[in-house]
Amino acid sequence: MARRYWNINLEEMMVAGVHFGHPTKQWNPKMAPYIYAKVKRKGIHIPNLTRTARFLSEACDLVFDAASRGKEFLIVGTKPKAAGSVVRAAIRARCHYVNKKWLGGMLTNWFTTKTRLHTFRDLRMEQKTGRLNRLPKRDVAMLKRQLSRLQAYLGGIQYMTGLPDIVILVDQHEEYTALRECITLGIPTICLIDTNCDPDLADLPIPANDDAKPSIRLILNKLVFAICEGRSSYIRNP
């Protein structure tokens, strides 16, 4: 896999607050190789941005290569600070996404998920054609509630026809269930890992602040740019 230049610089990461970790009492000792220093006054760890830049560059190379071969991506970030950035990133890169709640078994029980997606598509079609409104009022109200729930939880994967090739996780702790499902199925993962995370669980960890919106946005923007470049390469050379 060839290495490319992704315009990743330390100053930009510092402005985005990528270098702010969790309180020192919350740290995971496995993160020691990724930590630059401890700020005593604030009691927090500072991730080593040189290593962050290196791993982010490797992640960009990986997703570019995968996208250039037509692979499918799933971006997962369900906490409020990540949800908006996840949607924008996924739409821009034409990726699947989950930004509300991870339903247990979404990947490991793919048959059930696929059945739910069929139900979701059928209800949407019923609504678009107006057939839904011809039903009794009680049934209409119940089906509309079901449609709203399916839209919230499955709207980002409504066009997913099979398991993703790579999953990008914004917060390892928050998305632990999704991460375990990926590990079970052998799906490669790219994880933003803060100083309280376990880097061994991710196939490609990116040490970074996973709580600040600017930090999340910067990391996702770099990955999305690489995916878009890879997709363009795939279109030119199918």
Curated annotation (Swiss-Prot):
Biological process according to GO: translation
Q: GO molecular function: any one?
A: structural constituent of ribosome
Chief location of this protein?
plastid
Record-linked HAMAP family: Ribosomal_uS2_B
Q: Which GO terms describe its cellular component?
A: chloroplast; mitochondrial small ribosomal subunit
Xref: InterPro entries: Ribosomal_uS2 (IPR001865), Ribosomal_uS2_bac/mit/plastid (IPR005706), Ribosomal_uS2_CS (IPR018130), Ribosomal_uS2_flav_dom_sf (IPR023591)
Q: Please report the name of this protein according to its UniProt entry.
A: Small ribosomal subunit protein uS2c
Has the keyword Disulfide bond been applied to this entry?
no
UniProt keywords (A-Z) are: Chloroplast, Plastid, Ribonucleoprotein, Ribosomal protein
Q: Which family does it belong to?
A: Belongs to the universal ribosomal protein uS2 family.
Q: Which PROSITE patterns match?
A: RIBOSOMAL_S2_1, RIBOSOMAL_S2_2
Q: Where in the cell is it found?
A: Plastid, Chloroplast
Database matches in Pfam families: Ribosomal_S2 (PF00318)
Superkingdom assignment:
Eukaryota
